[in-house]
């Protein structure tokens, strides 16, 4: 069989899909890195706000600069590029498997989480601190749950039984909460 136009188009689509997938993964990694680190900066900024004198002024000013550079220079661009590349892959895939529908639901929720971080970012840039460092630590772990769920769905490529998935997520959430409590005790000693 010769290499007709149909085969060439199919091969080109496969190659294109792989390159887009690689870029999609890279921007997912940088997006998650940004979300994990921005909450750490929120925590440090919140704790710096509790200090007095020059230490407070110097630290909060520095954390605002670091937050702005991270959020606007890395995290938002990565979220936007992820949003562009994901649907592009979906179009090239040419179908919508069941696992992808479930994954997309969690991706929409992840963007909701991202917007909640943007709300906190804007408030902290204005000097408004509504959340304690402990609440921010707990909020930070939500990204971990999203990461586990989305990666497992994308890797296993099937909708796991709801019982297995629910038990796994609840177990992970409990382990994360336990780790936060242990860390809090270690910090206060």
Region spans (language model):
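Polytopic transmembrane helical bundles with strong interfacial aromatic enrichment
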Residues: 9-189
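Low-complexity, intrinsically disordered Ser/Thr/Pro- and acidic-rich segments
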Residues: 3-8
